[in-house]
Amino acid sequence: MLKLSFRSLTSRLPRLSTLVVRGYASVANTGIEASNTSENNLNIQEQLNDNDKKRLKQIRNIGISAHIDSGKTTFTERVLYYTGRIKDIHEVRGKDNVGAKMDFMELEREKGITIQSAATHCTWERTVDQIEANEKQKTDFEKSYNINIIDTPGHIDFTIEVERALRVLDGAVLVLCAVSGVQSQTITVDRQMRRYNVPRISFVNKMDRMGADPWKVIQQINTKLKIPAAAVQIPIGQEDKLEGVVDLIQMRAIYNRGSKGEKIEISQQVPENLIELAKEKRSALIEKLADLDEEIADIYVMEEDPTPEQLMGAIRRTTLARKFTPVLMGSALSNVGVQSVLDAVCDYLPNPSEVENIALNAADSEKPVSLVPSSEKPLVALAFKLEEGRFGQLTYLRIYQGTLKRGNYIYNVNSTKKIKVSRLVRMHSNDMEEIEKVEAGGICALFGIECASGDTFTDGSVSYTMTSMFVPEPVISLSLKPKSKDTTSFSKALNRFQREDPTFRVQLDNESKETIISGMGELHLEVYVERMRREYKVDCETGKPRVAFRETLSKKVPFSYLHKKQSGGAGQYAKVEGYIEYMDGVEDESGNVVDCEFINKVTGGTVPTQYIPACEKAFYEALKKGFLIGHPIKNCRFVLEDGAYHPVDSSELAFRLATISAFRTAFLQANPMVLEPIMNVSITAPVEHQGGVIGNLDKRKATIVDSDTDEDEFTLQAEVPLNSMFSYSSDIRALTKGKGEFSMEFLKYLPAPKYVQKELVDAYNKQQQK
C-alpha cells in the first residue's frame, strides 16, 4: 500500500500536454499559451500524412551535454558502439592513441577534451525483451529508432557549441558525475536547455568510482537545478563491483555481460539485498509523479499501484512538459547502463512532431508561424553551424519543414541568394555519407554554400525566418601578430574562425595597429592560436591577455551642442539637444541583451528626418570606444529631443560630428565609471587543501557564495573579478598538488574599485599622449 501525502491529496493538476513549444523567444512571446499546446499538437498531427507520422515517430534529435570530465564523450562512444555505428571502443585518453570517435580534431585528442560539437547518426534496435514488454502493455512504440546525436563540449570556453546544438535539438541527455554531482557547467547547460525549451533525461555516470552517491546527485538536481527528479533505476553493486541496474518501473534486474557490456541479461528477480531499497525508491518515484501528473495523482489517492505502462506514460508526459527529469545510472567506462539510456531516449524524449517550432513570416509583418514537420510542406531549414571541411565550407542544417533534395535550388532568406544543392551529406564525426534527400525532422550538411550561422533557407515559396541562437559577449582579449610576413594565411585563418564561431571576434586597434582577438577565456583563444599554427602554418606572437572592461554612466545629463564650421565654400552646421541616461539591459527575442538605445523625440522638424539616421549611427559608433579607457560603453540611452539646422550648411556629416561631440561632453559629466567582468568560479579539490584555496581566493578579492564539503573533497562557488584570475591555473595546481580543478564563466559586470579605475584611466591617457 502506498503512503499518502497531503500535498498529493489536495493538488489536482491538469493533465500535462505532450507538446514541447520551441518559440522564437519563449512561450509567452509566441502568443501560444501552455494550456493550448495539446490543441496545437493536434493541429500538427492533422497536417501530417501517415508516412510522415510513422517516419517521425522513429526519429530522435538529441544532444549530450555535461560539465567537463563527466564522461560525456565516453558515454557517446558506447552509444555508437552499441548501436553498431563503430566496430570498436576507443577511450578519450586511451593507450592506443586512437581517441574517441567524436573527438576528431588532433587538439581534442591531445588535450582529452571536446572543443567542437560533433554530429552523428545511428540506429537503435530495441532489445527483444523490451519489445515483448511493450507489446504486452500495448505501449505505442517502434522497434527501431533513428537517432541524430550531437556531442557537445563541457568546457565553458566553448559554450557556443552547446548553444547552437540545443537550438536545433528536440531533447537532451544530461550526464552528471556520480561523485561531483551538479557542477558549474551543469548549471550553465541547464540554463541553456531552459532557454531553448529542451526536455532532458539525466544519466548519473561514473557509478564505478569510489565515493559515488547517486542520491546526492538527484537531490542536487532537485535543489540546484530546480527541476523535479527521481530515480527510475538503482545500481546493482558498487564501485568496481558495479554490474547492472534495477529497473524500478518493471521491477527487474538488468545486467551488462560480455567484455564490452554488449550482452544484456534481464532477470525478473531483483537481488534480495536490494528489494527494500527498490521499493523505497519506486515509491519515491510515484510520489514525485503524483505531484506532477493527474493520472498518477488519481491512482495515488486511490492507494493503488500504477502499472508500468501508466508510470512510463506519466514520465513521458512530465518530461516533455519539462516538469520532470527521469534519472538513470551506470558507468560508461565500465560499460554499464548505457543501453537503458538509449531505451529512455526513445521512451521519454520527443520526436519532431511533438515539438512546435516557431518561424516569423517576413512577408507578413513577421507574424509567428507554427512549422509542421511534413515532408510535403514548403522547405524551411536553419543553418546552425559552419565548419571548414576538406572540400570547402560545411554548413550544418536542421530541416524543420519540407524536403531537401540534392540538385534542388534553395533560397537564403537572410541574404536573398539562390543556391544549388550540389552535395548533401550526413555527418558521422568527421566522416561523411552522401545522401539524396533529407526530410523534415532530419539533420544534414551542405558543401560550398556561402551563408552565416543562423541563416534560414527555404524553397522560395515562403519567406519564413528563424531567430538565431543566444551569443554571449567575449570577456577576454589579446594581441596577435604573425612571426612571418605571410599575412594572407593569417587573414584566411581569422576570417574562417570568425565565420565558424560567433564568440570569436577580431578587430584592428587603429592606434597600435595590432590585431586583437577576443573570446570566452584563455583556453578558447589558446586553441585558436594553436589551430592557426597547425592548420595554416602560421606561428604568432601573442600579447598579454586583456580583460574586456566596459564603461558606463551613473547619472542623467542633458546636452546641447552646436557644431558650426565655416572655412569658405560649403560650411557645416548642426545642433543637437537632449539627454543621456543609464538604462538596464533587456533581452531581445533571441535572448541577447540590448543595453544601449537611441530614441528620437524630435518634433516640429527642428532636426530634419533625413539627418536622424546619421545621429543614430554616430551614437552607436561612439559606443564602440569609450572616453575613459577606450573600451565599449554599455547601459546607456541617448534621447534626441531637439536641435537646429541650416538649409545650406547642414549635412549628415555635420549631424554625425555634432552627435559624437555632444555624447562625449555629456558622458564625461555623467559620473562615468569603469565596469569589470565578474566571473562565477567553481573549484573542487581535496579537503586538506581547503584553507590554502580560500586564502588564495581572498587575495584575488573573491566573494564566496556557496560551499559544499564531503568526506574527501570540497566544492566552492565564488564570484571573482576576471582581472584577478590570470595565472590561476598554475596556482590551483600548486595549492592542491595537481588534484584541484576549476572552471569559470562570465556572470555580470560590476563597477571596478576606484584604484583599478584610476590605474586604467592613467594608463589610457599615457598611451594617448604617445
From Swiss-Prot:
Q: Any idea which UniProt keywords this protein has?
A: Elongation factor, GTP-binding, Mitochondrion, Nucleotide-binding, Protein biosynthesis, Transit peptide
The source organism is: Schizosaccharomyces pombe (strain 972 / ATCC 24843)
Q: GO: which molecular function terms?
A: GTP binding; GTPase activity; translation elongation factor activity
Provide the protein name. Answer: Elongation factor G, mitochondrial
Q: Which gene encodes it?
A: mef1
Which family is this protein grouped under?
Answer: Belongs to the TRAFAC class translation factor GTPase superfamily. Classic translation factor GTPase family. EF-G/EF-2 subfamily.
The UniProt entry's GO CC annotations, sorted and at most eight, read: mitochondrial matrix; mitochondrion
Q: Does the keyword Electron transport apply?
A: no
- Domain tr-type G as annotated: residue spans: 57-353
Q: What does this protein do?
A: Mitochondrial GTPase that catalyzes the GTP-dependent ribosomal translocation step during translation elongation. During this step, the ribosome changes from the pre-translocational (PRE) to the post-translocational (POST) state as the newly formed A-site-bound peptidyl-tRNA and P-site-bound deacylated tRNA move to the P and E sites, respectively. Catalyzes the coordinated movement of the two tRNA molecules, the mRNA and conformational changes in the ribosome.
